[in-house]
UniProtKB/Swiss-Prot annotation:
GO terms for biological process: adenosine catabolic process; hypoxanthine salvage; inosine biosynthetic process; nucleotide metabolic process; purine ribonucleoside monophosphate biosynthetic process. It is an enzyme of class 3 (hydrolase). This is Adenosine deaminase. PANTHER family: ADENOSINE DEAMINASE. Binds 1 zinc ion per subunit. SUPFAM superfamilies: Metallo-dependent hydrolases.
């Protein structure tokens, strides 16, 4: 018998998450406590519920630039090794509680040195938090693997330095590199040196592209930078035409994106908040899934979007009528697209994801 697709049941399904920002996933209570501990006085509220409402409301801005503004508060309380360790630990705890079995969590080390820490110390603290979180989850009967992507800010000029950081930590839990931040005026090609360095070291990277900006951002990320994955990439829909009879025609950029199986790290709720799409029902996720792009489901910023992987999946189920086999496919897509070794990916797919979805599908 097929298990009903409720939030409770979806929460029991194994999930793989590729696009989640550490500084966008703090618990509101943790933000308050860290602010008190470290003397951060700029929070807009001193009540947990009011603070949660602030982050959620501020994120529903219709603009990527305005969506990013509340991050000043989360980053502001993440300036010590102890704070970074705690946030990383709780991140793993929260993801494991949602039955995420694999996650790549990203953050920008350059944003966490205001308290005097060096970049290496910042990464060390986060990786230690992830490792301790994994152990705690295992002790609670929930197995999860969390790896790290280090991100460079696209408006800054430290991307080569951050790419070198990724390579230094590649055997200690960092599996890739990313650039993030406001897209308009800061094309991916500003950071070619960093991407060339990653390729020269046989390393993997994803690029935020096609979120607030359009097709040129995606084209640069693929054609000139050589991205292994696209962070968001939702604007690829602008290169797809659907005729009145339902026939779908791909433009050349969309075609090569699909043909090369370049994964899309789609974040439905976040895309609505930033104005990239009007609503979940109007999100191109389903069009992209039906035309066999490699789509994945992601949270982006769990605090700002007040979301979990289970909630993202449920919203897609409600909008597009997906079943367990669809959710399994999206999860396998993510696992196939992860930056860990092939045999580790395969083990999670064959030993964890497929068997558990088979039970749910009846």
């Amino acid at each position: 018998m097929t298990t009903p697709l409720t939030l409770e049941n979806i929460s029991q399904a194994p999930k793989a998450l590729l696009h989640d920002h550490l500084d966008g996933g703090l618990r509101p209570s943790t933000v308050l406590e860290l602010a008190g501990q470290y003397g951060y006085d700029d929070l807009p509220a001193d009540d947990v519920d009011e603070l949660a409402t602030f982050f959620r409301t501020a994120a529903h801005s219709g603009s990527l630039v305005r969506y990013l503004e509340p991050f000043a508060h989360t980053v502001g309380v993440m300036q010590t090794a102890e704070a970074l360790h705690r946030v990383a630990f709780e991140c793993v705890e929260d993801l494991a509680g949602d039955n995420v079995v694999y996650a790549e969590v990203r953050f920008a080390p350059e944003l966490h040195i205001e308290g005097g820490m060096g970049l290496d110390a910042v990464v060390d603290a986060v990786l230690a938090g992830f490792a301790d979180g994994e152990k705690a989850a295992a002790s609670a009967g929930r197995t999860i693997t969390v790896r790290c992507l280090v991100t460079a800010m696209r408006h800054a000029a430290r991307s080569r330095e951050i790419a070198e950081l990724a390579i230094r930590f590649r055997d200690r839990g960092v599996v890739g590199f990313d650039i993030a931040g406001a897209e308009a005026g800061y094309p991916p090609t500003r950071h070619l040196d960093a991407f060339e360095y990653m390729r020269g070291n046989n390393a993997r990277f994803t690029i935020h592209a096609g979120e607030a900006f359009g097709l040129p951002s995606i084209h640069e990320a693929i054609a000139f930078c050589g991205a292994d994955r696209l962070g968001h990439g939702v604007r690829i829909v602008d290169d797809i035409t659907v005729a009145p009879d339902g026939q779908v025609k791909l433009g050349r950029l969309a075609a090569i994106l699909r043909d090369k199986r370049i994964p899309l790290e789609l974040c439905p709720s976040s895309n609505v908040q930033t104005g990239a799409v009007a609503s979940i029902a109007e999100h191109p996720f389903d069009l992209l899934a039906r035309t066999r792009f490699r789509v994945t489901v992601n949270t982006d910023n769990r605090l700002m979007s007040d979301t979990t992987m289970s909630q993202e999946m449920l919203r897609l189920v409600e909008a597009f009528g997906y079943g367990w086999s669809d959710l399994a496919r999206f999860t396998i897509n993510a696992m196939k697209s992860s930056f860990i070794p092939f045999d580790e990916r395969l083990a999670l797919i064959d030993d964890v994801i497929k068997p558990r979805y088979a039970v749910l599908a009846g």
